[in-house]
Amino acid sequence: VYEPTLAISMNIQAVVITCFMEIHIKEPIEKEVNPRLLPGELLLCEANTVYKYIQEDGSNRGTCGKLVCTNFKIAFLDDDSASDDNEPQFKNKIVGENDITLQCVDQIYGVYDEKKKLLTGQLRKYPEKLIIYCKDLRVFNFCLRYTKEEEVKRIVSGIVHHSQTPKLLKRLFLFSYASAAPNNTDGRNQTVMFDTLEDWRDELERTKGNVKYKAVTTNEGYRVSEKLPLYFVVPICIWCWSCHNGAALLKMSAFPKEQDDSTSQTQKAFLDGIYKTISKPPYELLKMDDLSSSLPSLQDIQTAYTRFKQLFLIDNSTDFWSTDVKWFSLLESTNWLEIIRRVLKKATEVAECLERQHTNVLLIEESATDLCCVISSLVQVMMDSYSRTKSGFQSLIQKEWVIGGHSFLDRCNHLHKSEKEEAPVFLLLLNCVWQLVQQYPPAFEFTETYLTVLSDSLYVPIFSTFFFNSQHQKDTHTSGESLKTQSGPFRFLTVWDWSVQFDPKAQAFLNNPLYAEKPKPDKSQRKTARFKHQRQLSLPLTPTKSSTKRGFFREETDHLIKNILGKRIGKFINSSDEPPNSFREFYDSWHSKPVDYHGLLLPRIDGPEVKVWAQRYLRWIPEAQLQGGGTIATAAKILDLMEEVQSLQVKMDEEHSQAVSGGVHSVPMMRNSARLSSLFPFALLQRQSVKPVLPTSTWKDLEDEDDLVKRDDEFVDLSSDMS
């Protein structure tokens, strides 16, 4: 019963809506807040008096504002949106805290009479609440109960249409932005793009690949294949990288399983050409690995990740605590960490062949643009310290993924055309690299925050890096006459220019303060380090190869052709003199020695060593935060010490009258550690959510007398430790 004296101010800016009573309010007086639009961005629809709310312990706390949809993003604007007060230190200049790019929208649910329903296509009835699940694992709840009916129809229909329905490639905001934005950024930023012949020649020289390898221009104008890059290295298959001992990492696509006579003859001629090449030094020692027979399929990877991400798409704190008691069981059932473990193990096996056996490795996959990219990239990160620098890692992504022809457009399903092609292959690589980063932090110039924002950039359609299936597709869509701009030739931005998204202060979070550059050897030593057949230099653990093995492919050519033209190539073609447990011996031997952070790195893959990438997957869940804890506690202390060292260095330089220059490596001020938590730098200390003494799931188990140990664990009250 409401008191007759109860009054609600017309100037109210926020309301509290509870599940136990309904509060009737008049439309609040709103300040005019307009969205900040990028070049080429157009406002499509908007709705006023929308409440963005957070569900907690059965109650809703919300903020009143405006919900808008543009051809680039969905944005919620409140009075604080136009204010620069309390601006976070780590701020993205393109995507704000309450912004969702259209490509980042995963699923949209409407709430009808407290029941959720997936929204797709045309709507007959419009919901009173809207829940948006994002691919970066954010969850947005909007209440439309106090919004005008016509505005509800426009905003809901607009959001669903522009974020969930199939579209043409040229309709992406990528093209609108590129045609309207000024071309005044430095896209290369020390990153090798591998779009010129010189880039490939320089990479051959850097890795000291065999002198018989050659960068070619055969595919200029895409005369040979639209799938291949304009330039690549031959003679055998596609060259990826050369080890210091001369062994090479190669890749090729698999032959189709079903063939006619003409196709079979063509493939036999191709294999004869391979035989003539690999029967001579330095290719006669070659091991083939068909990744389709040793790693999960793309469908298995997609299924595992779909299950995995559901653990982090939390609607409210009640759901969080109800699943907390069985979280590890749910995690194991997704199989996501097991897939990461298998990929790391496979990369270690390949590294063992290159490093210990001095053997060339040929990776084979249906298209050679998915798991081949994952394994070849991981091997280079593990074996080449240059790939562990920021510019080196970015160059690696350009070489193996962007120029290598990974179908980002299809695998990320940016156009919403086919869910069958969707698979988080690139995200799988970042998860594997993160395992190495958290196991060996001093070995990497970049941080886990760098990997996190790189994963977020998959869904920011102002960069061309992750929005094409091949270099040919990109070149085709940039060469049209209709794409000329007034300021000059049409050019896309690359994600590697981090100044577009972050200012210098924020970019400091991408750089690892613990990293030390590899000391450069003397030129005299560098000249004597190159040998004609470096592959023949053996490590102490490397067994001596008998001369009879050099005729392996000549003796087994017919058998090799049958294998390739058959269903599948088997796993590694193992040498008879190779011990069966050579991988485990190599793995255990390496881990028993001190780590050289500029040398070979092998991931720890046993037991609980493979972990959840907490920063990426838990950063939006306040209940999972550690106040003043997590890796940020260590990083904050290190950065404070570095700041003090830098200030002392400034004083010393001033005494010697030397100019002090600033740059992106400037250390951010983080003195106020009381506001830090494990969510930092993506969020400061958020609301506390105390674990209930009796979790919801326990009530259901009270009548069951079994499993007393588990029940006792559920009754543990940790709330006193969180205060």
Labelled PLM ranges:
Residues 11-54:
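Disordered, polybasic Ser/Thr-rich segments at the N-terminal boundary of pleckstrin homology
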Residues 250, 354, 359-381, 433:
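A phosphate-binding catalytic loop at a beta-strand-loop-alpha-helix junction
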Residues 78, 105, 109:
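N-terminal cofactor/phosphate-binding cores enriched in small/glycine residues
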Residues 27-31, 35, 43, 54, ...:
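Conserved N-terminal structural segment that caps and organizes enzyme catalytic cores in eukaryotes
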Residues 1-3, 12, 719-723:
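A positional/structural detector of protein chain ends, strongest at the extreme C-terminus
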